[in-house]
Amino acid sequence: IYPVINAQNLVIANYPGFASENENKMEKIYSQSQKALFREIIWPSLVAIERKIDAKLTCMMTPQFDYGDENEPREGEVAYYLKLLKEEYGEAGLSSGNVSGTGLSEKMEKDETFWKKEAPDYCFQSLYLQNEDELGDALECEELDGIRTIVTRESQTSDEPIVSFAGEEVTLQRATGDGVNHTFMDDFRQRCIQTALGYSNTVWDLLAAAYPEKKDDAWEILSKEAASNICTYQKPFTAFDETTISKSDQRIRRFLALSYSAESEDNMISLHVDGLEEEAWFLLHTGTREAEDIQGGSFSVVEDGVYLICAEEDEVKIRLSEEEEKQLFYYED
């Protein structure tokens, strides 16, 4: 028995944008504007995927992608998307993504006026950081004082933790998949992470759809691949909770601070959680035995011999079924 995060995230990075950009390419590929693409095509597709796996969307927004042109972000549209997200029990975050090579600090300084006018009462708590080299800048940026968690792309090395503290008060959540690509090794890695942490963080970056460079970047192809991968490869993990990125942040903080002890005697497992203020989750592997009863919490089946334990009190008692007696067979010549 060991603690897990119990959080499954679906993050849509660089969606939506609010400026009329790349219009010639949009007309050529989609026969409509970027605004119409985001509203009329992409949003219904995202909702269909989200509802199929009962996910909670986190959309990382940006006022614009190109800070080098003269196209300014449109007014009056942020409230529309915030309303849509609220209806789907999702949330919005900020994105550092852009196509003009604008640094994080400069971008956030330019964006601040827009957000204060268009979403004055909305508390953005998350940031999608397209370039992890700018992590230090993100932690020091005054415009990002309210950010509690930072999302980055998948780690390219094995020594970087999936979840951690980026600073004293800010957590870091690395992507565990991009939604579009899913190889055999990707699947193996995802299963390992789910077994160890009860956690996934699919970060689907839609910048390519707004600024397609090749045929496979078109939304029709991107969405088909992503819908297949996300809906298929999340199926084995339905026992875990679907969360927004800020809810995941809360659970990560609880997970990283957790102190517990466990012992077993006969068919009883005793679990003690120090200073439990909210729920905490554990994975219990029982082999061939079954969990029959629990006091101080609840359990659900992940797969045969594996249970997700929700500790609701400091002391949790779990009763397992009696172990079946092994039958020995002897053969005589």
Description of each model-found segment:
Residues 143-181:
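His/Asp/Glu-enriched short active-site or ligand-binding loop at hydrolase and phosphoryl-transfer sites
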Residues 16-20, 44-145, 158, 201, ...:
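Metal-dependent polysaccharide deacetylase catalytic core of the NodB/CE4 family, i.e.
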Residues 1-20, 45-50, 118, 129-134, ...:
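Catalytic grooves of carbohydrate-active enzymes
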Residues 303-333:
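C-terminal beta-strand-rich structural cap/linker in extracellular carbohydrate-active enzymes
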Residues 242-287:
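Surface beta-strand/loop "capping" patches
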